[in-house]
Amino acid sequence: MKASVLITLAVLGVMFVWASAAELEERGSDQRDSPAWLKSMERIFQSEERECRKMFGGCSVDSDCCAHLGCKPTLKYCAWDGTFGK
């Protein structure tokens, strides 16, 4: 009786280690590939031309900022210009 319980526990332990190793191997390949994937996504977003800069976005002139935002001359960021409307 004791021997069968020990054998069962040993088999379960081996199966657990085997399954964990297989899962770690799958995740490892994803983690190695993810930096390249993130870099390609970063290039895509950097290459897009944006219509305007949103609140606190960097700017050089007022026309860089979205509607109702103006470029603050001292720190060069888009902030509310005090106007309302559509």
UniProtKB/Swiss-Prot annotation:
Other comments on record: Negative results: does not show effect on Kv1.1/KCNA1, Kv1.2/KCNA2, Kv1.3/KCNA3, Kv1.4/KCNA4, Kv3.1/KCNC1 (all expressed in oocytes), voltage-gated sodium channels (Nav1) (from DRG neurons), and in a range of voltage-gated calcium channels (expressed in rat DRG neurons). In addition, does not show significant toxic symptoms when injected into mice and into cockroaches.
Tissue: Expressed by the venom gland.
Record's protein name: Kappa-theraphotoxin-Cg1a 4
Source organism, top-level taxon: Eukaryota
Family: Belongs to the neurotoxin 10 (Hwtx-1) family. 28 (Jztx-11) subfamily.
Pfam families: Toxin_12 (PF07740)
Localisation: Secreted
Task of the protein: This toxin acts as a voltage-dependent gating-modifier. It inhibits the sodium conductance (IC(50)=124 nM) and slows the fast inactivation (EC(50)=1180 nM) of Nav1.5/SCN5A. It significantly shifts the activation to more depolarized voltages and decreases the deactivation of Nav1.5 currents upon extreme depolarization, but only slightly affects voltage-dependence of steady-state inactivation. In addition, this toxin causes an approximately five-fold decrease in the rate of recovery from inactivation and an approximately 1.9-fold reduction in the closed-state inactivation rate.
